[in-house]
């Protein structure tokens, strides 16, 4: 029995693995590649060039690989690349890249993108991230591994969201969020570190203690960023987790959320 509903529209130039399932009324355009074990529900639109890996599930009414609304976009061939084991829930919109950046929007592996979230052009979502309902990322946003963006989080273009960070519901992020930091509010403010996330992922007590002290150095001692980074050097040499925190601050181009 065919795994593609006869009411779906599949362009002859699309390339689907033999066991890909496609529901009724979905439309898959040319230059779309979908890997084995992936399930496309009903009423999904996928436009190429788009590469979707293995064992993903895309729910109804999602728009995947559409042109960017960036006014500079003139129809250049740009891409969307999605890895493996991602869940993309109802009504999600994901746009392809632009030639002004890498020409590619990238989503890694094992991510949960919940209903009505938006991922803008040229954004990069790493692995094991959660974007809760109605989260919206502008163009060129980078989200690190294990980050969680709670519902209605808004992220300004070019912001970097660090690994293991967390945003509260309705947060408006306009600056970079360092790794492990919890932010909340409009505009976003740093509140603490994501200790619950560290606990769930099995961080050692020593690493958590070192990160707690690192947070105090950056956010509680009244130091400049440069002075705080200098003071973190010894701890960063001893704990890779502190090095990740320090490096995410050092790499910031928009300034960090304070």
From Swiss-Prot:
Family: Belongs to the transferase hexapeptide repeat family. LpxA subfamily.
Role description: Involved in the biosynthesis of lipid A, a phosphorylated glycolipid that anchors the lipopolysaccharide to the outer membrane of the cell.
Catalytic function, reaction form: a (3R)-hydroxyacyl-[ACP] + UDP-N-acetyl-alpha-D-glucosamine = a UDP-3-O-[(3R)-3-hydroxyacyl]-N-acetyl-alpha-D-glucosamine + holo-[ACP]
Protein localization: Cytoplasm
GO biological process: lipid A biosynthetic process
One GO cellular component term: cytoplasm
Listed PANTHER family: ACYL-[ACYL-CARRIER-PROTEIN]--UDP-N-ACETYLGLUCOSAMINE O-ACYLTRANSFERASE, ACYL-[ACYL-CARRIER-PROTEIN]--UDP-N-ACETYLGLUCOSAMINE O-ACYLTRANSFERASE, MITOCHONDRIAL-RELATED
Record text on subunit structure and interactions: Homotrimer.
EC number: 2.3.1.129
Organism: Stutzerimonas stutzeri (strain A1501)
Main location: cytoplasm
InterPro entries referenced in this protein's UniProt entry, alphabetically: Acetyltransf_C, Acetyltransf_C_sf, Hexapep, Hexapep_transf_CS, Lipid_A_LpxA, Trimer_LpxA-like_sf
Coiled coil: none
Pathway assigned in UniProt: Glycolipid biosynthesis; lipid IV(A) biosynthesis; lipid IV(A) from (3R)-3-hydroxytetradecanoyl-[acyl-carrier-protein] and UDP-N-acetyl-alpha-D-glucosamine: step 1/6
Transmembrane domains' residue ranges: none
Keyword annotations: Acyltransferase, Cytoplasm, Lipid A biosynthesis, Lipid biosynthesis, Lipid metabolism, Repeat, Transferase
Source organism, top-level taxon: Bacteria
Keyword rRNA processing in annotation: no
Name of the featured protein: Acyl-[acyl-carrier-protein]--UDP-N-acetylglucosamine O-acyltransferase
MF GO annotations: acyl-[acyl-carrier-protein]-UDP-N-acetylglucosamine O-acyltransferase activity
